[in-house]
Amino acid sequence: MDDDYLSSIFEKYLHARKIFKNKEVLRHSYTPKELPHRHKQIDDLAHILVPVLRGETPSNVFVYGKTGTGKTVTVKFVTEELKKISQKYNIPVEVIYINCEIIDTHYRVLARIVNHFKEESGIEVPLVGWPTDEVYAKLKEVIDAKERFVIIVLDEIDKLIKKSGDDILYSLTRINSELSKAKVSIIGISNDLKFKEYLDARVLSSLSEEEVVFPPYDANQLRDILMQRAKEAFYEGVLDDAVVPLCAALAAREHGDARRALDLLRVAGEIAEREGASKVTERHVWKAQEKIEQDTMEEVIKTLPLHSKVLLYAIVMLDENGELPANTGEVYSIYKMLCDSLDVEPLTQRRVSDLINELDMLGIINAKVVSKGRYGRTKEIRLNVTPYMVKNIYRHDEQVRPLLTLSLSRQRRLF
């Protein structure tokens, strides 16, 4: 392949009709100047945080709602506005945003807070290695260096608590009694409405929190959000009239998920751009839906526990051998062989039956209970994804990669 050929490819895409004016507007991380259909939640948060402007410590806040209901973007919007107006009144406010899906241990959260002040304090905590008590002592030292309000936003806090326990919340909710100058308050963001059930009584008693709930968007509200973003994201005239309503309708089926709606619109635009199309059409939206679902499914399979991955591969092998639908017993016998080949202790058939139900709920397989007359009822198990997809994922997974070398007929001969 010569340089001229590569150059011509880049030239072709460079001079194709541009679809996007500013694609970043469609990213989840973008904070718009206006948030349609979230005025009540903005008012609620502003009312809870306004004591800062009077020099008083605000209550802790827990923000609840399903994925894509505007929780994170609204919290960022309100805290950014609070920082702006606090400067007008000469009230020092620091907002520390922490994504607990990534920063997911007690130690790492404390380290992230300390390191927020590293330019001011000259103190930087490594990602691992210090005793947690020492990190907490440094946290108090850097926060309390001057009079100020520190608002700590813990996004996806439920994931942090489920993984690492609630000690971090206990520490942060009691920290004000150990500070002389600064004041700390917490905003927790959770997809799990039952989040507080995971908390110890001692944490609950020290929280003194308020709650703000974000309901799902309906199709009309999603359409308004997309129309607002589309004006900034796309050049005029490149979107067919049906594109935004279709993206909104598809996302409304996914419990009113604005993130899904934005992803659909962005990916549809990317597909149109790649094709060299002059317009984004409904066809591009349907292709985007297909791609997003495939990407989502791949991510689900990648994050399955080991035994679920082995079980799924047993079903893949049966599918490739033309033996689906299969019943639980047939799948279990292959699963046991695969466990043996990996030198892993197999689970009981009853537990594997539960895992089959979980894979069914995730949409990876279909496990339908059917009646066999006098032989009773049994599950008929089918694969909902391609064997190629599963194998491609397992190729990059050291735990289950050895399964790719096995053949069903040979495994049966060995057993």
From Swiss-Prot:
Can the keyword Nucleotide-binding be found in this entry's annotation? yes
An example Gene Ontology biological process: DNA replication
Q: Which InterPro entries match?
A: AAA+_ATPase, AAA_16, Cdc6_C, Cdc6_lid, ORC1/CDC6, Orc1/Cdc6_arc, P-loop_NTPase, WH-like_DNA-bd_sf
Kindly give the CDD domains that the UniProt entry links to this protein.
Answer: AAA, Cdc6_C
Q: Known SUPFAM superfamilies for this protein?
A: P-loop containing nucleoside triphosphate hydrolases (SSF52540), Winged helix' DNA-binding domain (SSF46785)
One Pfam family in the UniProt entry: Cdc6_C
Residues bound to ATP: T69, G70, K71, T72, V73, Y217, R229
| Keyword check for Nucleotide-binding | yes
Q: Which UniProt keywords apply?
A: ATP-binding, DNA replication, Nucleotide-binding
Q: Name one GO molecular function term.
A: ATP binding
Q: Which PANTHER family match?
A: CELL DIVISION CONTROL PROTEIN 6-RELATED, ORC1-TYPE DNA REPLICATION PROTEIN
What does the sequence similarity comment in the record state about its family?
Belongs to the CDC6/cdc18 family.
What this chain does, per the entry, is described as: Involved in regulation of DNA replication.
Q: Report the HAMAP family cross-referenced here.
A: ORC1_type_DNA_replic_protein
- Spell out the protein name for this chain: ORC1-type DNA replication protein
- The source organism is Thermococcus kodakarensis (strain ATCC BAA-918 / JCM 12380 / KOD1)
